[in-house]
Amino acid sequence: MGKQVTCRRVYEQTSFEDGKRVLVDRVWPPDISRDDARLDEWLGDVAPSTGLQHWYSHEPFRFAEFRRRYLAELADPEHRSALSRLRHLTDDGKLILLTAAPDADHSHAAVLAERLTGADRSEPDRPAPPPPPGYRAAVSAKVANLNAGAFAFVMGTGIVSTALNINGAHTASLALLVVGLAGCAVLLPAYVWRLLRWRQRFVADLVGPRAFAFLTVSIAANVIAARLVADGDTAVAGAFLAFGAAGWLLLGYGIPLGLIASTRRDASFDQVNGTWFLWAVGSQSVAVAAAGLARLTSSHLLQVLALVCWGIGLMQYLLTATIVLARLLARPVAPGNLMTSSWICMGAAAISVLAGTRLLELPPEGMLLSRSVVAGSAVVLWSFSTWLIPLLLALGVWRHVLRKVPFRYELGWWNLVFPIGMYGVTTHELGRTTGTSWLTTLGRWEIWVGGVVCVVVIAAMVAAAVRPHLMARRAAGSNRRTA
């Protein structure tokens, strides 16, 4: 009887016919508890290196090269103990290798199964690189693995566009606005395509701890609306606000309900992260856009909406901060898991300040709160967001310098652009509204910092997109010379 080794996603339904169930991922998979996983063992040491996983990114057209590199890694002595244990389990009977990868058949678990069953008996010393995929296949793979928070790109470009417009850099501001609108035009159909074509993956993200990242869709629409208000485009801004407010209402209730009602969630704090602050950012983004539009249209309804959303956002910020702080203090934080999303904590406070300054610009007769209450709250929140910046920078030094987590472009970098850009806008507008000149000056300098960060992240994004194609061409040329 031959060896029975198969690979499977850890989220799939378990069966009494399963043999030994072994998780072969380096980190615990999100959205599933240890009881639901029904593991016999967890051998994370046998997983690919972090660098190889980042390079692969579950792109099917890279699988052949990924397989070759991973097999080479498995030959290292550090994997010897874990491989020996897997071989022992294989000899005992049926073995199920579990992974959280979106496609188990094109994951390291499949390569491990091949290695354990002896299927990979021969492989060339220098295999030819896989041919580049067709355009349709490449786009399909990107959409299948689309990050739930992809609209963070639009949030970042939108707020920096607003910031540069304040500083008088109108051409650069318009260029970033166009980039943000183009991002909306590309990403929104991609979300719909993923929902229709890969519904299971989409729903898994929507009911898990990563669900708050979907609020970037609503926030991005409201950020664009606020930017268009500055140009006086009330009709288009109103359309973006309507879409953003509808998304905020749907997701603002749906995501917490999904988390509470889910039967597959982890009971620990492990899955709590900085993206949960997007719950508060969503409410404040509606407040900012609605208040700006109310000032131009004299709409009492929009003024009330802005005030109510501002109050809701403040309470959501306090609730989220409590949960995130409890998670940070109660559970150890791995350097690799301390993502740039931690900066959203500062961004959420900053956008709350901006919403407050926009409320202060509205007619006093429509205010349900004293203007001194709004102004005082804005100053307190600005002070807190300012205090957070050195702490976040120190955490970045701990992550990248002391714990040597490499700098690699990832979508999370846009979670850094948005808070920095928002802080610059907030500081300037708070100074202008309160007549504090030094705040206005500080805000102008912060805006330029946000612009530089945005340019750096765009350059890193383009480099990350181009690098695989350059590597494939270089490898192809090397193989032709060798032949």
Q: Predicted regions span which residues?
A:
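Residues lining hydrophobic/aromatic ligand-binding pockets adjacent to catalytic sites
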Residues: 1-123
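N-terminal signal-anchor module of multipass membrane proteins
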Residues: 126-192
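Juxtamembrane helix-loop boundaries in multi-pass membrane proteins
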Residues: 132-162, 198-226, 241, 260-289, ...
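C-terminal transmembrane-bundle signature of multipass membrane proteins
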Residues: 156, 186-190, 327, 348-365, ...
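Helix-coil boundary and interhelical linker segments in multi-pass alpha-helical membrane proteins
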Residues: 162-173, 227-238, 290-305, 358-374, ...
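Membrane helical hairpin/interfacial module
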Residues: 169-244
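Structural signature of hydrophobic alpha-helical transmembrane segments
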Residues: 174-188, 237-250, 304-319, 378-387, ...
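Generic multipass alpha-helical transmembrane bundles of integral membrane proteins
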Residues: 276-396
